[in-house]
Amino acid sequence: MSNQLKDLFERQKEASAGSKQEDNEEVLQFIGFIIGDEEYAIPILNILEIVKPIGYTRVPETPNYVLGVFNLRGNVFPLISLRLKFGLKAEKQNKDTRYLVVRHNDQIAGFFIDRLTEAIRIKQTDIDPVPETLSDNNNLTYGIGKQNDRLVTILRVEEILKKDF
């Protein structure tokens, strides 16, 4: 497990210490990250690893959001730019850029993100569905989580990993 993931777990543990949750309320855990100016999250159970950017190889005839493939300890995985997937312009990587290595069933891929934020705990009752009028890509979004004074868009890993080419 990477040090960043351990740090996120530690911060989450500290934040939850002393806070009283009702026993009958389901609390879901996510990893938060920034793409552009917005905060997104994916379920913590889908995260295998968080790594600093490593080299990747372009693959011809793939959508522009598939940056290519990268080799992580002898395993080759596709690398998906969430910026490009969401229709934002590409940005060069910087010191905050990370790859989230995610899994859904037997599919594994890397998500190229702008910046990691924190481990997030949200009560199921604090997650609202996405209004249908907002986007044609609603299937990518599980819902909008409300945490303190901010909103976090919760993504469906399984939908992002679906091939649309």
From Swiss-Prot:
GO terms classed as biological process: chemotaxis; signal transduction
Disruption phenotype: Deletion abolishes swarming.
Database matches in SUPFAM superfamilies: CheW-like (SSF50341)
Domain of life of the organism encoding this protein: Bacteria
InterPro entries: CheW, CheW-like_dom_sf, CheW-lke_dom
Pfam families assigned: CheW
GO cellular-component term (any): cytosol
Function statement: Plays an essential role in chemotaxis signal transduction system in order to colonize the host stomach.
Family: Belongs to the CheW family.
Protein name from the UniProt record: Chemotaxis protein CheW
